[in-house]
Structures are given as structure tokens and as C-alpha cells.
UniProtKB/Swiss-Prot annotation:
Residues 162-175 have a biased composition (Low complexity). One of its GO terms (cellular component) is nucleus. It is found in: Nucleus. Belongs to the Abd-B homeobox family. Pfam families: Homeodomain (PF00046). This is Homeobox protein Hox-C12. The keyword Nucleus applies. It comes from the Eukaryota. Keywords: Developmental protein, DNA-binding, Homeobox, Nucleus, Transcription, Transcription regulation. Residues 214-273 bind DNA.
Amino acid sequence: MGEHNLLNPGFVGPLVNIHTGDTFYFPNFRASGAQLPGLPSLSYPRRDNVCSLSWPSAEPCNGYPQPYLGSPVSLNPPFGRTCELARVEDGKGYYREPCAEGGGGGLKREERGRDPGAGPGAALLPLEPSGPPALGFKYDYAAGGGGGDGGGGAGPPHDPPSCQSLESDSSSSLLNEGNKGAGAGDPGSLVSPLNPGGGLSASGAPWYPINSRSRKKRKPYSKLQLAELEGEFLVNEFITRQRRRELSDRLNLSDQQVKIWFQNRRMKKKRLLLREQALSFF
């Protein structure tokens, strides 16, 4: 056993000039992990208090992150209760004046919404989770404001315009616009082509201004006029100016009417020839 083993790194290293791990770096340290007596020993005491944060004494520090909420919150609340974290403040809401019969409300709707204490009798209406009540709903204040209990028009389901201030804000502006448009101009200045006697239609909207030229009513040719024009066309497709004047005087037509009729008749003949040529190929 005293012979040198060829597989010993301490013996092979100097022979082949290869520095092994134990001979080059740590000559006093072996691969088995044993520590020689010459090396100093370092002691690492175990600390129980690992956390540096100051937690309450009732909760021991165990190395796990602490929750942010002080009180335990159920992740699956029952359906009958609403989550307390999602509750809105009790002071939030919109107010509406009860509007007494004798006194008129001086505040508008926007001012009443901003001021919670609008009046001593202000009633708090809680917010509904379904969204705004009158979303996409347009109320006709002109029809529902003056109707009272007679039911002039159907109001919004949550905020009917029962206050005098709402009536004065909305219906007066709409009614004034209609009266201003009706009384500004002369009723006779706006004439409808379908109803020349009346200036305005049933809905109150004007048809045409007086400056616009109405279209002349179409007057078809009589059989006698068509027969004379067809006979002249068979004689000469392109009528002269002198012959056109003679036809217009004899048939009680204008020169422009005779000219346009001959143009249309030539185009009709051309279409008939093209149709016959197309049918001849088949």
C-alpha cells in the first residue's frame, strides 16, 4: 500500500505537467470537504428574527408576505350581500327639490346636482347600478310641461319635469323658437307647389321659397301633332330651320319643341337599328 498509485492526481500531476484542482488552487484543501486544522473556522449563528420590518407583536414573522388588508375579506361573498369593498359612499347621490306649489325653484338642474344641501327639504335619491335612467331618451318638454296631469306626453321614468324651473328652462326656449319662426316672415311669402293657397304645410315647415322656379307641367303631343311630325320625319330626318318654323306655326308648337322632337326621333331610330343588328347575329 506504500506504492504510489498511478491514478492519484497528486502523483500524475507533476509527471505530465498538469495542475490539478487540489495541487494548483488549494493545496491544503481536499475534495472530500474535510478542513485542515490550519484554516480558520467561521461560525454563522442562526437568526430567528429574519424580517427587518416592524410587524405587530400579535402576528409572528414567519418569512411570508403579509396581506395588505387589515381585516380578513371573503373571496366568495354570498349572493345576498354586496361586497363591502365596492360600496360607494353614503353621501354620494343626486338631489331633487320637492317643489312646493307656491314657491318657484330658483336653482337649475345642474346647480341642484352640485349642491347637496340645496334646500331644507332636499331628498336624497340613491344611485342605481343599472346606469343613467334616461340614457338615449329625449323628453319633449313642450308637450309634457304644460299638459299637467292630462298626459300631454310620456316623461322619463325617473325624473319627471314637475318643477317650475325645468318648465321655464326647457319649454320656453322651444316655444319661443317656434313662435319666432312663424311670426318673423309673411305667411304669403312661402308657397308650396302642391298647395298654392297655403303658405305652410300641415307640419309647419315651408316647401319652396318664392324665388325658386317651379317645374312646368308636361303637356303631351296630340295625335294630330304626332302624325304631322312623323310624316315630316319620313320625308326628311334633318329638318331645316324654315320648315321647322312652318311646322311649329301650323301645329301650335314652339320652335324648341319641334327641334327636340326630331332629335329624340333620330335617337329612337338609331336604337332600333342597333337592336336589329344585335338580333341578326342570333
